[in-house]
């Protein structure tokens, strides 16, 4: 089964399962949030679903409630960190800069950001 094999080899699935340690800042039955190992801003954490989803490109209708929960968790965690302005980033596919094939959202804050991002 491809899904099972992907999740067994996935570093984010291993973090979600507690097999790899992380600086967890939030966790519930559906998702986990943890500080980025290589922060690009004073505050930089990732929010991921525990379910293995490769990227936004592989979502289906059954994932809509999960995605809403992730967005609400991002809102709460930003407020918990007193972020009035922040950036949420997800990369899709290799050309989009995705390096871990598990859907994840970077939340960056604590400094001013500019556009274009590059």
Give the positions of each predicted feature.
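Glycine-rich phosphate/oxyanion-binding loops and their immediately adjacent helices
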Residues: 1
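HIT superfamily nucleotide-processing domains
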Residues: 4-118
């Amino acid at each position: 089964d491809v899904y099972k094999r992907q999740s067994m080899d996935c570093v984010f699935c291993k973090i979600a399962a507690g097999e790899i340690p992380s600086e967890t800042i939030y966790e519930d039955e559906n998702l986990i949030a943890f500080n980025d190992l290589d922060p690009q801003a004073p505050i930089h954490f990732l929010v991921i679903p525990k379910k293995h989803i490769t990227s936004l490109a592989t979502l289906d209708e059954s994932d809509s409630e999960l995605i809403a929960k992730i967005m609400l968790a991002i809102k709460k965690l930003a407020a918990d960190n007193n972020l009035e302005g922040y950036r949420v980033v997800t990369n899709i596919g290799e050309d989009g800069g995705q390096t871990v094939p598990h859907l994840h959202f970077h939340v960056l804050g604590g400094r001013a950001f500019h556009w274009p991002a590059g």
